[in-house]
Curated annotation (Swiss-Prot):
This is Elongation factor 4. Gene3D superfamilies: 3.30.70.240, Elongation factor 4, C-terminal domain, Elongation Factor G (Translational Gtpase), domain 3, P-loop containing nucleotide triphosphate hydrolases, Translation factors. The keyword Chaperone does not apply. The gene is lepA. It is found in: Cell inner membrane. It is a peripheral membrane protein. It catalyses: GTP + H2O = GDP + phosphate + H(+). It comes from Aliivibrio salmonicida (strain LFI1238) (Vibrio salmonicida (strain LFI1238)). The keyword Membrane applies. Signal peptide: none annotated. Residues 2-184 form the tr-type G domain. Belongs to the TRAFAC class translation factor GTPase superfamily. Classic translation factor GTPase family. LepA subfamily. InterPro entries: EF-4 (IPR006297), EFG_III/V (IPR035647), EFG_V-like (IPR000640), EFTu-like_2 (IPR004161), G_TR_CS (IPR031157), LepA_C_sf (IPR038363), LepA_CTD (IPR013842), LepA_IV (IPR035654). SUPFAM superfamilies: EF-G C-terminal domain-like (SSF54980), P-loop containing nucleoside triphosphate hydrolases (SSF52540), Translation proteins (SSF50447).
Length: 597
């Protein structure tokens, strides 16, 4: 056991986590040179295309250190994006230490801080590593000072390396062996294993990634899942060397995968404990706090025949992604679908893209909303995650919106731009600290503003230098209203949005103008209106197509022309009563972009 090291790699987006993990695998000979591909651990196509890590991946390597001993290194590569921070906390629960990778050119950024504090709260040993020292812009001494100043951990002695060229990677491995403590646990005691992650394999059923805390797991053991109490037989067990390799068992402190032939998706929830069916442990391991979705949107299959497939696909995806929440929803405009909860806009895009790619579905998304706390006149408290569920204006006493605490790190020269952006987003300043050239800003900004396009705007206003980390703080009383869209005086439930009263007029007008571009012209006028309750705040009309009925009269009596025009008018009127308007997919997407440009 004293030769096992469990660690994860944490860093801000693009500071070189995945490249460093590639190098570690190569140096330890986990894969032959021929199998080596850039970003080995980013196994989803989507991860490679966007160049980001979405799912945490684990690898077991054997490393012979300078002292002649062979160590088993289990490491877990984690995502850096703010939407996936729950993946990071899950990975950290399985480790004794973490490598904090910092780009020697860019220095400390918001995500570095957030992940580092998560690790320190879990009592992990945090080892700073300065990466990208081969860049001309690298200034390791300044960055080391920055780490000490902002993060507050010893960094002058930090290992320096360049994951791209492979310089200093051996030193990193030595540091891991020296600085990260060996796992503690009782090899003889009753078995306890923590499920870090699970996914669904069409042949094997549920595959779980586990970390054995006490005891051991062997092939053909009878084990039980503690939350459900069901017993299973261990069919296959093994490790990743990135490839799945079968072994006879896992001992205390090791990380590996287990297949028990569980076919039910809810059979082995993430964060649960596995133990032996007979003589197992009594207590469950402390799991992870459940993450609450911050953004909700309706997802509907374009053809209603896909509904069953869509439901199965969501089930399989939610096994792999513990933070995805979904419940059935029906809409008069779009038919049957699901109301899904996500951690942020990137998460929502990724899930939608994974559903469309991996399960071959065509989906329509409604506008994303956050969760509002609503107090009714009779004192009841409701949580509303969809504009359609918001009660009528006369029943409402107050609406409270969620406020996010945003920590922003920005170079001093872009401070003005960032502050004016925060004010435009109805933010209030909490704190501002100068660290050399960097400024740490803390703002309270309504979640609905953060979720929409705050991240993109922040990046563009600071030329990509500002970085953001946010978490839910509290609910606060606010003047929110629901803006409904009426098409020919009929409410379309899927187009409603909840917005602040001050922005309602502008958002309503933008929405109506946007809709006008996308709805095709019909044989009659289509009135598009935005309304708050019964009060219309904006309107535009899609003009009818009409035939020139008086073209065939030349000269002649005016009454003849009047008769033809009246006949046309009556026909159009009749048509308008029975005609209905088909809304194209683009019209629903139009709402997503309101207020972006």
């Amino acid at each position: 056991m004293k030769h096992i090291r469990n660690f994860s790699i944490i860093a801000h987006i693009d500071h070189g986590k995945s490249t460093l993990s590639d190098r570690l695998i190569q140096v330890c000979g986990g894969l032959s040179d021929r199998e080596m591909a850039a970003q080995v651990l980013d196994s989803m196509d989507l991860e490679r295309e966007r160049g980001i890590t979405i799912k945490a991946q684990s690898v077991t390597l054997n490393y012979t250190a300078n002292d002649g001993e062979t160590y088993q290194l289990n490491f877990i590569d984690t995502p850096g994006h703010v939407d996936f921070s729950y993946e990071v906390s899950r990975s950290l629960a399985a480790c004794e230490g973490a490598l904090l990778v910092v780009d020697a050119g860019q220095g400390v950024e918001a995500q570095t801080l957030a992940n580092c504090y998560t690790a320190l709260e879990m009592d992990l040993e945090v080892v700073p590593i300065l990466n990208k020292i081969d860049l001309p812009a690298a200034d390791p001494d300044r960055v080391a000072e920055e780490i000490e100043d902002i993060v507050g951990i010893e960094a002058m002695e930090a290992t320096r390396c360049s994951a791209k060229t492979g310089l200093g990677v051996d030193a990193v491995l030595e540091t891991i062996v020296k600085c990260i403590p060996a796992p503690e646990g009782n090899p003889e005691g009753p078995t306890q294993a923590l499920i870090i992650d699970s996914w669904f394999d069409n042949y094997l059923g549920v595959v779980s990634l586990v970390r054995v805390k006490h005891g051991s797991l062997k092939k053909n053991d009878k084990i039980k899942v503690m939350s459900t109490g069901q017993a299973w037989n261990v069919d296959r067990i093994g490790i990743f060397t990135p490839k799945q390799v079968d072994t006879d068992g896992l001992n205390t402190g090791e990380v590996g995968w287990v297949v028990c032939g569980i076919k039910d998706i809810l059979g082995a929830p993430v964060g649960d404990t596995l133990t032996h069916a007979k003589g197992g442990c009594e207590e469950r391991l402390p799991g992870f706090q459940k993450v609450k979705p911050q953004v909700y949107a309706g997802l509907f299959p374009i053809s209603s025949d896909d509904y069953e497939n869509f439901r199965d696909a969501l089930g399989k995806l939610s096994l792999n992604d513990a933070s995805l929440f979904y419940e059935p929803e029906s809409s008069s405009a779009l038919g049957f679908g699901f109301r899904c909860g996500f951690l942020g806009m990137l998460h929502m895009e990724i899930i939608q893209e994974r559903l469309e790619r991996e399960y071959d579905l065509d989906l329509i998304t409604t506008a994303p909303t956050v969760v509002y706390e609503v107090v009714l006149n009779n004192g009841d408290l409701l949580y509303v995650d969809s504009p359609a569920k918001l009660p009528a204006v006369n029943d409402l006493d107050e609406i409270r919106e969620p406020i996010a605490r945003c920590n922003i790190l920005v170079p001093a020269e872009y401070l003005g731009n960032v502050i004016s952006l925060c004010i435009e987003k109805r933010g209030t300043q909490v704190d501002m600290i100068y660290h050399g050239n960097q400024v740490a800003l803390t703002y309270d900004i309504p979640m609905s503003e953060v979720v929409l396009d705050f991240f993109d705007r922040l990046k563009s206003t600071s030329r990509g230098y500002a970085s953001l980390d946010y978490n839910f703080q509290r609910y606060e009383l606010s003047n929110m209203v629901r803006v409904d869209v009426l098409i020919n005086a009929e409410r379309v439930d899927a187009l409603a949005i909840i917005t602040h009263h001050d922005n309602a007029q502008g958002r309503g007008r933008l929405l109506v103008e946007k809709m006008k571009e996308f709805i095709p012209r019909q044989m009659f006028d289509i009135a598009i209106q935005a309304a708050i309750g019964g009060h219309i705040i904006a309107r535009s009309t899609v003009k009818q197509l009409r035939k020139n009925v008086i073209a065939k009269c030349y000269g002649g009596d005016i009454s003849r022309k009047k008769k033809l025009l009246k006949k046309q008018k009556d026909g159009k009127k009749r048509m308008k009563q029975i005609g209905n308007v088909e809304l194209p997919q683009e019209a629903f997407l139009a709402i997503l972009h309101v207020g972006k440009d």
